[in-house]
Amino acid sequence: MTMLTRITTDTSFKQHLRWSPDGKKFLFTRIHEGKMALWTVNADGSEMKRFMPNLDTPHFDGDWSPDGKTILYVHDVLQGTDGKLHIHRVNADGSDSKVVIPNKAFEETPRWAPDGKTFLFVSTRDGNQEIYRADADGSNIKRLTNEIAADNNPCWSPDGKRIAFASHRSGNLEIWSMTADGGDLKKLTDHPAIDFWPAWRPDGKTIAFTSNREGNYEIYLMNADGSNPRNLTHNPAQENFATWSPDGKKLAFISTRDGGSDIYVIAVK
């Protein structure tokens, strides 16, 4: 019997789930009363609250730094009127927000490197969705992918040597991996369904991902080399945005299995 725990019960739309480095909190995007904003909740489901309650413009898709002291997030300053998004960095208490990637285009999906010295992000600055890497202060930007098709959903391996990501480059959405410099491309999934949103387990041996290969979106696991893909959640609901606990023993995700959109945690052997 697989242990499954429901963390939230408010049913509001949620996405972009991230487990904190100390394992005590979740950071996620929530749409509530018509506003898209970052929220936090304790890992036991208590104290759900807006992360930056005084920020009224849309902000979403946050990521904790490895030391838990800062958060990168996407900010739609002009609420879609200019067709651009910024990436900001803010202290974990919500103070001192700064722009690190100005809004040249759609700048999104920031992901800290395991050493906290650089981060990945997705941008359309060169015409389509590509993956870039920048230093922690937003400087020294390097383009890692160069493909006509869209590349997105980047995720670091725990040792910082490789990056898993989703790409349309083979015709349908599959999960690939590359080195931290964009080399040694490897196709990890090969299925006519949609595979995306990879999440590398802290031990480096397993990758969780979302797929609709059995009809609806569910959470799957595969070995880090792409072998042995298997369905973890086995539920007719829609499930996405997997994130690992720091010890790698649990996986959190967002599911509609109880009618709304809530956070669940499942134990993983």
What is each model feature region?
Residues 1-269:
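Sequence signature of WD/YWTD-type beta-propeller architectures
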